[in-house]
């Protein structure tokens, strides 16, 4: 049986940890002047993926 392919886009965006699958929030790259300080602060920490989306990401990352 051939090796399964890892989805490279998903590999760059998600990291599997003991607590779940970690990812960075979106809309934090550029043009941040219109965003409030509170909003930027809330987007700062990494987030854990919701349970309903874990199965899809795990399929894309077979060796994670």
Curated annotation (Swiss-Prot):
Extract one GO BP annotation from the record: translation
Keyword Glycosyltransferase on entry = no
Q: Which Pfam families match?
A: Ribosomal_L35p
**Secreted as UniProt keyword:** no
Report the SUPFAM superfamilies cross-referenced here.
L35p-like
Keywords of the record, alphabetical order, are:
Ribonucleoprotein, Ribosomal protein
Among InterPro entries, the record links this protein to: Ribosomal_bL35, Ribosomal_bL35-like, Ribosomal_bL35_CS, Ribosomal_bL35_sf
Give the transmembrane ranges. Answer: none
Q: Which cysteines form disulfides?
A: none
Q: Name any GO cellular component annotation.
A: cytosolic large ribosomal subunit
Write out the GO MF terms: structural constituent of ribosome
Q: Which domain of life is it from?
A: Bacteria
**What HAMAP family does this protein map onto?**
Ribosomal_bL35
Q: Which family does it belong to?
A: Belongs to the bacterial ribosomal protein bL35 family.
How is this protein named in the record? Large ribosomal subunit protein bL35
Species of provenance: Vibrio campbellii (strain ATCC BAA-1116)
List the top taxonomic levels of the source: Bacteria, Pseudomonadati, Pseudomonadota, Gammaproteobacteria, Vibrionales
């Amino acid at each position: 049986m051939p090796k399964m392919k890892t989805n490279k886009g998903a590999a760059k965006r998600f990291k599997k940890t003991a607590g779940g699958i970690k990812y960075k929030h979106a809309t934090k790259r550029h043009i941040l002047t219109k965003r409030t300080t509170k909003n930027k602060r809330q987007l700062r920490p990494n987030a854990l993926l919701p349970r309903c989306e874990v199965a899809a990401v795990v399929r894309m990352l077979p060796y994670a």
